[in-house]
Swiss-Prot record:
This is Putative transport protein APL_0966. Keywords: Cell membrane, Membrane, Repeat, Transmembrane, Transmembrane helix, Transport. One of its GO terms (biological process) is potassium ion transport. Gene3D superfamilies: Regulator of K+ conductance, C-terminal domain. Belongs to the AAE transporter (TC 2.A.81) family. YidE subfamily. It comes from Actinobacillus pleuropneumoniae serotype 5b (strain L20).
């Protein structure tokens, strides 16, 4: 067999064995994708015994390309919600997540200095203790550029030794917080639901009868606050006739307008227009319909709604716009993106015409456009290679192959589309790309680390590494958990999601979800902090490597 055939065969064997190990669960908890690392260690131990040598350059390429695929697909997945998570609603959660990341970084520096732990070892322990594989890749890359030797094998071993308690430690933290604070799960779930219902302010509807005589005879566009684009006038009922209004529709006293917008804004418009009307403005039994259609036609990507002139040409109103699960007011200045779901109101034939214009080809939502993927990866690698020179640092700081593709993916996913290129990826395709990437990366890390893993694990040095990892895992979680619970008054279920997200640990999230079956509190806080934490976990090992290398 050729060298390439041997490597591919061994990688397949590692993946099969590792994924099988990852599926083994003890009381509902398993290694998950981390099992691939241990599969690689086992196979590497066997190849070492039989003297099988694998080409280092080929393995290095596979490892780096797998890492790129993994972080890029993560960025595309979380990009639409990343910037939203930094707004007011997520500041508290993200603040505590940053606290966990910061404390772990401080502990790494202290352990490195106090116990004279080699830099590659402590960075590998750090990555394993926080169960974050991309941080391992980032640390390996920056240490290689700093001139370190035998980086991959040493970091891989220390990562693997610290990894198991990284998973166990977060579950132990959740359990201890629950016991110490005597948490009542049902009560916490009820309080969370009540709080969510109070805060939730999506789009609402209101029927208003025009009784203000000053507005009679005016065109719709002449109504006060019409230009603010905070309310959609989707239907108008005059006597028994239903009309789809446009900007030039003349209003009469007694007309009933169907408004769509946020509750506070609707009440404000009611004060201007008249009184709430207990009248049905439904399209049932009329020539009008209200239907949904999805934007898939590349010719309208990036076009503003007003440029389509749907009201003027086709007498069709867009009453709602759903983008990545968030309902938005579809004002004329809003640019359409691939995957936007529009609620259309108008005659059936007019809606069909508009449907043809915007696409509404649902099969396209399941297709993967490959060109944008490689454009994004290429731009990410370029960004990751750009040096940032900081006075006093021996090497330039770079985002690297882990950070560059992640940042570019976050930005491109937020933008949505540029011309005919769109960065939407079906969830199934994104998951497949992400899993392939992480399996390739962990397989190679395991193959490189496995030769001396068992000897190291059973040595006093290996036991010390496990202890350092336990400290880095446990202390930031328990300290932040106590602070968030006592001073932040954080809901326990949300706190469990926060701890899982701060460690970017899906098995921990699965455990948190099982605390209260069918409740989404943990998943919501996990998703809120995950994007920022993933970014910080990739940047932090690079900063630590440069700072500690410079100080030594």
């Amino acid at each position: 067999m050729s060298d390439i055939a041997i490597i591919v065969s061994l990688l397949s064997l590692v993946a099969v064995l590792g994924l099988w190990i990852g599926h083994i669960k003890i009381k509902g908890v398993g290694l998950g994708i981390g099992g691939v690392l241990f599969g690689g260690i086992i196979i590497s131990h066997c190849t070492h015994l039989y003297g099988i040598e694998l080409d280092a350059h080929t393995l290095h390429f596979i490892q780096e390309f797998g890492l790129i695929l993994f972080v890029y697909s993560i960025g595309i997945q979380v990009g639409p919600g990343f910037f939203a998570s930094l707004r007011q609603s997520g500041l508290k959660l993200n603040g505590f997540a940053v606290m966990i990341v910061g404390l772990s970084g401080i502990l790494v520096a202290l352990i490195h200095k106090l116990f004279d732990v080699p830099l590659p070892v402590i960075l590998g322990i750090f990555s394993g203790a926080v169960t974050n594989t991309p941080s391992l890749g980032a640390g390996q890359q920056v240490l290689t550029e700093l001139g370190g030797d035998n980086i991959t094998a040493v970091m891989g071993m220390s990562y693997a030794i610290a990894y198991p308690f990284g998973i166990i430690g977060i579950l132990l933290s959740m359990w201890l917080i629950r016991i110490i604070f005597k948490v009542n799960i049902d009560k916490e779930a009820q309080e969370f639901d009540n709080n969510q219902n109070q805060q939730k302010e999506g789009l609402d509807t209101l029927n208003v009868r025009l009784t203000n005589p000053n507005l009679g005879g005016l065109k719709l566009k002449e109504i006060p606050d019409f230009e603010s684009h905070t309310v959609i006038y989707s239907r108008l009922k005059r006597n028994d006739q239903l009309i789809v209004p446009n900007v030039d529709t003349v209003l009469n006293v007694g007309d009933v307008l169907h408004l769509v917008g946020e509750k506070a804004t609707l009440r404000k418009m009611q004060l201007i227009l008249g009184e709430e009307a207990d009248v049905s403005v439904s399209t049932r039994g009329t020539i009008f319909r209200s239907e949904r259609a999805v934007v898939t036609n590349e010719n309208v990507f990036g076009k503003k709604i007003r440029h389509l002139m749907l009201k003027g040409k086709y007498e069709v109103v867009i009453s709602r716009l759903n983008r990545a699960g968030v309902e938005l007011i579809p004002n004329g200045e809003m640019a359409l993106q691939f995957g936007d779901v529009l609620n259309l109101v108008g005659r059936q034939e007019d809606i069909e015409t508009v449907r043809a214009i915007i696409g509404d080809a649902h099969q396209k939502l399941q297709q993967v456009q490959m060109l944008p993927i490689f454009v994004g990866i290429g731009l990410g690698v370029l960004l990751g290679s750009l040096p940032l020179y900081i006075p006093g640092f021996p090497v330039a700081l770079k985002l690297g192959l882990a950070g560059g593709p992640l940042v570019v993916a976050l930005i491109l996913a937020r933008i949505g589309s540029i011309g005919k290129l769109y960065w939407f990826m079906p969830p199934s395709a994104n998951l497949a790309l992400r899993e392939i990437g992480i399996v390739l990366f962990l397989s190679v890390v395991g193959l490189k680390a496995g030769a001396n893993f068992l000897d190291t694990l059973l040595s006093p040095e290996g036991l010390a590494w496990m202890g350092y990892g336990a400290i880095i895992t446990f202390i930031p979680l328990i300290v932040t958990g106590f602070v968030a619970r006592i001073y932040g008054k954080m809901n326990y279920l949300s706190l469990c999601g926060l701890l899982s997200g701060a460690m970017t640990d899906p098995p921990a999230l699965a455990f948190a979800n099982e605390i209260k079956d069918g409740h989404g509190a943990a998943a919501l806080s996990y998703a809120t902090v995950y994007p920022l934490v993933m970014f910080l976990r990739i940047i932090l090992p690079q900063l630590l490597a440069i700072l500690l290398w410079t100080a030594s």
